[in-house]
Structure formats: structure tokens, C-alpha cells
Amino acid sequence: ETLIGILMTTVICSTLFLGITQAKLYLEAIRVKEKAFIELKNFTNEWKSMVAAGVSNFPSDSNSGEKVPLKIDSNGNTTLEGNLYKKITKATNSGQYSIYYNIQTYITWDKKNLFFNKEKSLLDTLSFNTYQIQFNIQ
């Protein structure tokens, strides 16, 4: 009886600890996604304002994109990094008097450290697809 009681207690405690660990990892994934959303929103707004101001030549992204820290440890070291990308094209319906651009932005980050994932390349992505008119400021 004692051995069965000890075994049941061990199973229940290990299940409880596994549940607590999964909950912590899930909350951390939500924090990372929230930080990625904020970075992507700021990046998109920056390019929208540049289009609105009249910038018409847009540098192409490098293969790695623009790097931003998504998770920083207590020493200030970056532990998780995201990559921001953009694709800005003149809209097909854009006319002579109303010039507007399609702005596609997205951020990717590696989520292999979350939820005990063993896969080598497991990326998560958030993306925006918006339009911005170019103001004729003279």
C-alpha cells in the first residue's frame, strides 16, 4: 500500500510540475508575440510615413532583414531575435493624381526554444498588408 501511495503521489506531482512548466512557456510565447507585434507595428508605421512624405525609392531588404531583439535576459543580452522584412510596390490602380503604394511587412522569429520543440527551423510569423497614399506636398 505504501509503495502504491508513493507511486501515485509521484505521478500526480510530476503531472502538476509539467502543467506549470507548460503554462510558463505558453505565457512566454505570448509575451514574445506581443513584442513582435509592437516591433512590426512601429516598422510598418515608419515606412507608411516615409511613403506619405514622398519617398519613392525603397532599398531592398537583405536576406536576413532588419534584426530586432524580442527577448532580453537580465544582463541585457539578446536571447531571441526577430527579423523584419518589407515589400513596397506601387499599387496597380494608382493614378496620376492619387499615387498610393501597397506596403507588405512581416516579422519572423525562431520559436524552437518554446514548448520543448526539437525541430531545427521552426519560425513564427506576423504580417501586415496595408496601403498608403503619397501626399503631394509642395
Task: Put a short name on every predicted segment.
Residues E1-G19:
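N-terminal single-pass transmembrane signal-anchor helix
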Residues L7, T21-Q138:
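Flexible, low-complexity segments enriched in proline/glycine/serine and punctuated by aromatic residues
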